[in-house]
């Protein structure tokens, strides 16, 4: 799966260990999600195009580089809201396009219930964020929708992923690069990532 990138780094592995622990408090969990998301965005943005512009320093004029892509961050509600701030800090001029999905606990399929994209979405590179990439259903439907709206370039960032979901996703969207901090063992009978870290949304918003 050439479109799947698992980012190996000692600091990511250290932070993931704390993130997984059930004793980790919500405020610390949010901080770790923020930090790991920044690492992943750094990797996902390596091929962003640049343009040269002229500026004046305090000493003289010089040529510097500036991002030449319009970016749209697409958090999948609600858990991805914990990742949004870190991406915004790195790309403050980005727009945000919200995508709302809720998982049907019986079928394990993602039901699409809300979307709010910027008017120029088709002209932007979409960075979809969702901390958990489990069955792949939500990711597939999110990319299906974005492509139906004319979005040409999509990247996906998740903290944890299951191999089953990544394989299924790659079969449907091999043109979408996925950046994850760790690929876990798999899924349990309820479709949750194992060993995982629990429900990311509940841990971010302290609703356990």
Swiss-Prot record:
Binds 1 Mg(2+) ion per subunit. The magnesium is bound as Mg-PRPP. Its EC number is 2.4.2.9. Keywords: Allosteric enzyme, Glycosyltransferase, GTP-binding, Magnesium, Nucleotide-binding, Transferase. One of its GO terms (molecular function) is magnesium ion binding. One of its GO terms (biological process) is UMP salvage. 5-phospho-alpha-D-ribose 1-diphosphate binds at residues 78, 103, 130-138, 199. Its cofactor is Mg(2+). Uracil binds at residues 193, 198-200. Pathway: Pyrimidine metabolism; UMP biosynthesis via salvage pathway; UMP from uracil: step 1/1. It catalyses: UMP + diphosphate = 5-phospho-alpha-D-ribose 1-diphosphate + uracil. Allosterically activated by GTP. InterPro entries: PRibTrfase_dom, PRTase-like, Upp_B, UPRTase/APRTase, Ura_phspho_trans. Catalyzes the conversion of uracil and 5-phospho-alpha-D-ribose 1-diphosphate (PRPP) to UMP and diphosphate. This is Uracil phosphoribosyltransferase. It comes from Campylobacter jejuni (strain RM1221).
């Amino acid at each position: 799966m050439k479109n799947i990138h698992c980012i190996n780094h000692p600091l990511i592995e250290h932070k993931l260990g704390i993130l997984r622990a059930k004793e980790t408090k919500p405020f610390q969990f949010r901080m770790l999600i923020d930090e790991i998301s920044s690492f992943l965005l750094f990797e996902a943005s390596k091929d962003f195009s640049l343009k040269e512009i002229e500026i004046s320093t305090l000493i003289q004029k010089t040529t510097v580089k500036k991002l030449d892509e319009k970016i749209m961050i697409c958090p999948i509600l609600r858990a991805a809201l914990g990742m949004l701030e870190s991406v915004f800090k790195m790309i403050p001029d980005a727009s945000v396009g919200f995508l709302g999905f809720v998982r049907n606990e019986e079928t394990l399929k993602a039901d699409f219930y809300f979307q709010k994209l910027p008017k120029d979405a088709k002209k932007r590179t979409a960075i979809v964020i969702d901390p958990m990439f489990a069955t792949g259903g939500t990711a597939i439907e999110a990319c299906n929708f974005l492509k139906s709206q004319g979005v040409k370039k999509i990247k996906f960032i998740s903290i944890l992923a299951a191999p089953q979901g990544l394989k299924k996703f790659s079969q449907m969207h091999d043109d979408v690069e996925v950046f994850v901090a760790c690929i876990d063992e798999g899924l349990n009978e309820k479709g949750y990532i194992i060993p995982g870290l629990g429900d990311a949304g509940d841990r971010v918003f302290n609703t356990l």
